[in-house]
Design a protein with these regions (language model features):
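Short hydrophobic/aromatic-enriched beta-strand-loop microsegments
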Residues: 59-65, 135-137, 227-232
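Mg2+-dependent phosphoryl-transfer enzymes with acidic/Ser/Thr/Gly-rich catalytic loops
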Residues: 4, 21, 178-264
Length: 264
């Protein structure tokens, strides 16, 4: 049976503190040798993922900005993808709203709800909050669908969620930021649509694995055959009600390597 691997990045494939993936080397080699699509499924932007793929040495489909869109390299595995919209050198399936719509809401509510969005932060502030380097910050600000933000007053969260609902938007929590996004998108919906697409392309059922560590990964974990939680940097685990959930023994990329080797 064909397989797909969906993976979160920060705190899962990448270590929380230094963004390293060195300890995943053995599993990466096994995935490449087996020809299994490794689908980064992340809150990161297209620019961020493309740069990371270059460093990892892969050219695979990927899901960006918390399930907002799936990008597939043109001609991937020889598939005819002409039925999908073209975006640069990729084909795209869009699940989210435009960044302009998201920013309209953010700017209306940022003061009354004590939000500080990525679009308002200086590069220096983002470096301080994330530990990213200057180049990575530039990539992170090239957004198409969602706005990450810091909530200075947590008591405003419920009111903010209600307001977002009236705009057909929602608020979700990632590893470092909250995110404003379309009400009708999440990693789970993107995973479902991606699995359906690959089953059509392969003309057979596929087996799916997902690895994550944060609240915004739960929807992804709920819709795969083998859901895996990676131990957090502080030694805790994401709490879920997902049946048959697997847990890594190690944190970050070492835990990712451990679990991928177990199932690929």
């Amino acid at each position: 049976m064909k397989r797909l691997i969906f993976t979160d990045l920060d705190g899962t494939f990448l270590n929380h503190h230094n963004y390293s993936f060195e300890e995943s080397f053995e599993a990466l080699q096994k995935i490449k040798a087996a020809g299994v699509p490794l689908i980064f499924t992340t809150s990161k932007t297209k620019a961020e993922v493309e740069y990371l793929q270059e460093k990892v040495g892969i050219s695979e489909p990927f899901i960006v900005e918390n399930g907002a869109a799936l990008f597939i390299p043109e001609g991937y595995q020889g598939f005819d993808l002409s039925f999908l919209e073209k975006y640069d050198d990729k084909r795209i399936m869009v699940f989210g709203k435009s960044y302009a719509k998201v920013l309209e809401f953010y700017r209306r509510y940022k003061e009354r709800c004590s939000m500080a969005g990525l679009s308002d932060m200086s590069d220096e502030e983002i470096v301080h909050l994330t530990g990213l380097n200057q180049r990575d910050v530039i990539h992170a600000k090239q957004r198409d669908f969602t706005e990450p933000f810091i909530l200075k007053d947590k008591t405003k969260l419920e009111a903010l969620k209600k307001s977002a609902h009236t705009y057909e938007l929602k608020i979700t929590k990632g590893g470092r930021f909250y995110h404003i996004m379309s009400k009708f998108q999440d990693k789970g919906i993107a995973v479902i649509k991606t699995i359906e697409l690959f089953e059509d392309l392969y003309h057979e059922r596929v087996s799916s694995i997902a690895l994550g560590d944060s609240e915004n990964d739960i929807a992804m974990l709920e819709h795969v055959d083998i859901p895996i939680v990676i131990k957090k940097y502080d030694g805790s685990y994401l709490e879920t009600n997902v049946p048959h959930i697997q847990k890594s023994s190690y944190q970050g990329s070492k835990g990712w390597n451990e679990m991928v080797l177990k199932y690929v």
